[in-house]
Amino acid sequence: MLRDIINLLKKDNLQAQALAECHEMLSMCEQMVAASVESLRRRDDATVDVDILTMDKKLNAFERDVRRKVMTHLSLGNTSDLTAGLVLISIVIDIERIGDYSKNIHDLATVHPDKLHGGSLEDDVAHVERDTLEILSRASKAFTEGDEELARELMAEYKDDISGRTRDMERALVAEGVITDSRQATALALYLRFLKRISAHARNLASSVVNPFDRIGYPE
């Protein structure tokens, strides 16, 4: 799978342009996630440093353009690029969804304008938050540079750390009621779910570096 993607970098065609757009989308997603987290967790007025809505619309336009370029390229008979084209169509969905979840976090900030604190779960919330930002950055690097070793590390870390820790906190919030303020508990539950989904889509991106097309999003 990695070889198919790397080969695109050596070409100048519609599919290579689609790959470049995926790289640009990833850069935008990193900015959007970081800014939305800052807005929710560290500001009392929900201000955000980038235009989340405009960037989200641009991501949507990029997604459509990637699909269109891949379809056009393959329809011209470039069957040797079929696998790479299928990969791009698959992962561009994950990239666009990361943008959607960053918008969800910002939307949460606007209805919860106070800084969102994790209460007794703060250390764990902060841990998942840091890991999510890091896994997104490293997944982007693994995909852009074709780093198989880094991709494998990220796939293992998501399952061992983010997924399990988030599940434990969700249980504490819902079953054990460790946060008694319903507004805070609801906001935390939503935030954790958004972070978990961002991490999962980043993991899918990493899996595209090492897995065949039919196993993207699954263990190697």
Each model region followed by its residue ranges:
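Cytosolic, long alpha-helical scaffolding segments
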Residues: M1-E220
